[in-house]
A protein has these predicted regions:
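Amphipathic alpha-helical segments
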Residues: 116-141
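Intrinsically disordered, low-complexity regions enriched in serine/threonine
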Residues: 1-88, 144, 148, 159-359
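Sparse, context-dependent recognition of short Cys/His-centered cofactor- or disulfide-binding micro-motifs
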Residues: 49, 111, 115, 139-141, ...
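A short, surface-exposed helix-loop junction/capping segment
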Residues: 94-117
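Extracellular structured ligand-interaction cores
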Residues: 151
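Generic amphipathic alpha-helical segments used as scaffolds and interaction surfaces in large
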Residues: 51, 55, 113-121
Length: 359
């Protein structure tokens, strides 16, 4: 499992810093204007008595293009080759089809261009609600955490809920809490299996819980204005986070953990063929893996000297420790879980395996 930020204290300090530095606005798109110079696109926001200016981040560029109906490949070409045309296109469509949008900014940068009904489930509040629950769960410990440009992650294992896949090969139950403040996915609580022998984490999609960022529509006004937490919103969020606390407290489920362990054991009996290079190429095409990821998986697949489906799953999750980006590392852990489920289910349908009955 890839290690992110060093300590929970470091994580909390960064979340507090971001809380102070961020600014969220609701703006009529007619009050917005972009201007691109020397490869940098700035967006200005008229608030009535002032004009605020922010540099567009990469995610905001993509969200802006999508909302305005500009094909992203063409958007990027204008951005690189004809920035004046980009500005004309964006400013024209912002004015022609006016609507309210939420602008999320941090450190002078527009990081998200979202619906005005987007519910702000902030990372600091999430951590404040989730960490006390984790601390009260017997044997639970945060073993990896990070805050990236797009997501917050807390990866937790329960040291008391463990079993052997085969003698000497121990796995522990756990879960992952993740959240995006910029519209790149729901707040999720996903089951995790942690293999001690190689420190691999595998995320299962089967029993994941999701909470979506959909909230109330904001008031109607022509001028942009800053969003603050009001008492009604705070009350709504309290109820919401109480539900999240309930999900987290029940995230380590022994019956579901045992079902995943049974699938891991079943995967040991599934052969992947006689050509590991071809096996990894097929895998790479199916899950859109880049050359470095394919090379890493192949290396671990061969070094593990286990060419069963179980060995392939472990090669994928082990490769997550080799990538630089924490988001991508987590996605490879999810791919490992999906690969396990699909391989075992496919073998069972062909009559090659008999799966245990669901709990």
């Amino acid at each position: 499992m890839k290690q992110g930020i060093k300590t929970i204290q470091n994580l909390y300090e960064e979340l507090e810093r971001q809380r102070e530095a961020r600014q969220d606005l609701i703006a009529d798109t007619r009050s917005l204007k972009v201007n691109s110079t020397n490869g940098v696109t700035m967006i200005s926001v008229a608030t009535g008595d002032d004009v605020l200016s922010y540099r567009l981040g990469e995610i905001a560029h993509r969200q802006l293009a999508e909302r305005l109906g500009i094909p992203y490949k063409y958007y990027e070409r204008m951005r690189a080759e004809y920035p004046v045309l980009l500005d004309e296109n964006v400013n024209g469509w912002l004015t022609k089809n006016p609507e309210k949008r939420m602008l999320r900014t941090l450190d002078g940068r527009l990081r998200a261009f979202l619906s005005d009904r987007y519910r702000r489930l902030d990372n600091l509040e999430l951590v404040d609600h989730v960490l006390p629950v984790i601390s009260q769960m017997k044997g639970c410990e945060v073993v990896s955490a990070d805050i990236t440009e797009t997501h917050l992650y807390l990866k937790v294992i329960n040291k008391t809920m463990k079993t052997e896949i085969v003698p000497g090969d121990i796995v522990q139950a756990g879960f992952v809490v993740s959240n995006s403040e910029i519209g790149l996915g729901a707040l999720k609580v996903e089951p995790l299996v942690y293999r001690l022998i190689c420190k691999n984490g595998m995320i299962s999609k089967d029993y994941a819980h999701k909470k979506y960022h959909t909230g109330r529509q904001v008031e109607d006004t022509d001028n942009a204005y800053e969003l603050y937490s009001d008492e009604t919103l705070a009350a709504d969020d309290k109820a919401y986070f109480m539900k999240v606390q309930d999900i987290v407290s029940a995230a380590v489920d022994e019956a579901k953990f045992n079902l995943t362990v049974d699938k891991l054991r079943s995967a040991m009996r599934i052969v992947t063929g006689e050509n590991p290079v071809q096996t990894v190429e097929v895998l790479g095409d199916r899950y859109v893996l880049n050359k470095l990821e394919r090379a890493s998986i192949l290396r671990h697949f061969i070094m593990g000297n286990d060419f069963s489906h179980f060995g392939l799953v472990n090669a994928v999750t082990r490769s997550s420790q080799d990538v630089a980006d924490y988001n991508r590392a987590t996605e490879l852990e999810r791919i490992g879980g999906t690969l396990l489920d699909e391989g075992v289910d496919r073998a069972a349908k062909k009559g090659l395996l008999r799966l245990p009955a669901a709990a």
